[in-house]
Amino acid sequence: MSREIVNIQAGQAGNQVGEAFWRMLLAEHGLDDAGMYKGNDPQQIARAGVYFTQVDSSGPTKYVPRSVQVDLESGVCNRLRSGPLGQLFRPDTYFTSDSGAGNNWAKGYYTEGAELIDGILDIVRRQCEATEALQGFQMIHSLGGGTGAGLGSLLLSKLREEYPDRMLSTFSILPAPNVSETVVEPYNSLLSIHQLVDNCDLTICIDNEALYDIAVRTLKIKSPGYKDLNQLIAKVMCGVSTSLRFPGQLNGDLRKLGMNLVPFPRLHFLMPSFAPFYDPKARTFQRLSVSELTSSLFDKKNLLVASDPRFGRYLTAACIFRGKVSSHEAENSVMQLQRKNSNLFVEWIPDNVSVSLCSVPPVGQPQAAVALANSTCMQELFKRNLDQFALMFKRRAFLHWYTGEGMDVMEFTEAESNTQDLISEYQQYQEATVEEEEADIEGEQ
């Protein structure tokens, strides 16, 4: 039986990345743009029910995404409706308005978003009612704007209230340190992080700077556009969900993934990586061994987040290998990597790297691997954000845009101190040793 996931894509970035994700998902499951099965391997659709609802009124079965598309502007969703995937989504799963959130978190969370949230929740409920064993939700959004960040945060808190025992996971696109879209990004993203810490079980962090580097350095794209970057995010999203969508032996659902990756509930921010990324011109000359694939996964160049794992320690990680890879090889190469870099892995969590295999490779590649890592170097991201936030907040810059929407200055202070706490928790576990952890556990008992 498929344990279903409801996908929610919020805001401009969420819907554009969502489109790339669904396109790749269709290709992997042998479905065409209208959701009709065109493949020849029954394994392709054995567990397609995780993300798709099957509709067979009369004639062949159509696979419809279990998805909700939300935006406070209608432009991106209209393009989705009239684009190649126009026949794919159910028309009643779109929710748009024309008010816009103007890159203002408070508009998305308090004013515009709060007026519309009930209508959005109705669509989500309808999708949930049509499932047999809902495992949880995944949200695709960016943290720098108004809709994905503000309305996305509001939606998460409502889902947490209404479905307290279901997994909430997000693919959250953080503002890039060097590529700024709007001046108030530091406010929007810190207010969102504050919400994600409390209302989410798994947050997979992605930032545009790291994506841009991969596109330029590795893929040799001269001036990458969002379409190129979204393609990279979709690769990782499909890779991460492999063990949910195809028969496999480990991390078969979101909760198991969470149990293996999140040792402390607040520290659920994960770094994704993918291998191999390579220049399409050189692909015919490349075939990586399993140990090369493994070391690429833990290499800064293959991370979709601009942080350096050498400055932190891995609490946990999950590696997913796709294609013809034997479990013996995969587990051996991960063990060797841990042995060689033992200082980068905490020693007080035994067996902290899980390995799962999927025999179905990504479309157009003989093999690939993806990893999700919970590393203390994630604090770099939050520090960077906090510093930019503090610079503006100290001068009370642009604060009137937020207080004008009914927000209290106290909320900014709370978000700041919650993020400071998060950073010091990461630091504490980075420096912890086996003895300290054992003492802590005994103390708690």
Curated annotation (Swiss-Prot):
Assigned protein family: Belongs to the tubulin family.
Pfam family, one: Tubulin_C
Annotated function: Tubulin is the major constituent of microtubules, a cylinder consisting of laterally associated linear protofilaments composed of alpha- and beta-tubulin heterodimers. Microtubules grow by the addition of GTP-tubulin dimers to the microtubule end, where a stabilizing cap forms. Below the cap, tubulin dimers are in GDP-bound state, owing to GTPase activity of alpha-tubulin.
GO molecular function: GTP binding; GTPase activity; metal ion binding; structural constituent of cytoskeleton
Keyword vocabulary terms for this entry: Cytoplasm, Cytoskeleton, GTP-binding, Magnesium, Metal-binding, Microtubule, Nucleotide-binding
Lineage: Eukaryota, Fungi, Dikarya, Basidiomycota, Agaricomycotina
Complex formation: Dimer of alpha and beta chains. A typical microtubule is a hollow water-filled tube with an outer diameter of 25 nm and an inner diameter of 15 nM. Alpha-beta heterodimers associate head-to-tail to form protofilaments running lengthwise along the microtubule wall with the beta-tubulin subunit facing the microtubule plus end conferring a structural polarity. Microtubules usually have 13 protofilaments but different protofilament numbers can be found in some organisms and specialized cells.
GO biological process: microtubule-based process
Biological source species: Suillus bovinus (Jersey cow bolete)
Subcellular localization(s) per the UniProt record: Cytoplasm, Cytoskeleton
Residues binding Mg(2+): 73
Cofactor: Mg(2+)
Gene, per the UniProt record: TUBB2
One Gene Ontology cellular component annotation held by this UniProt entry: microtubule
Chief localization: cytoplasm
Protein name from the UniProt record: Tubulin beta-2 chain
Binding site for GTP: 12, 73, 142, 146-148, 208, 230
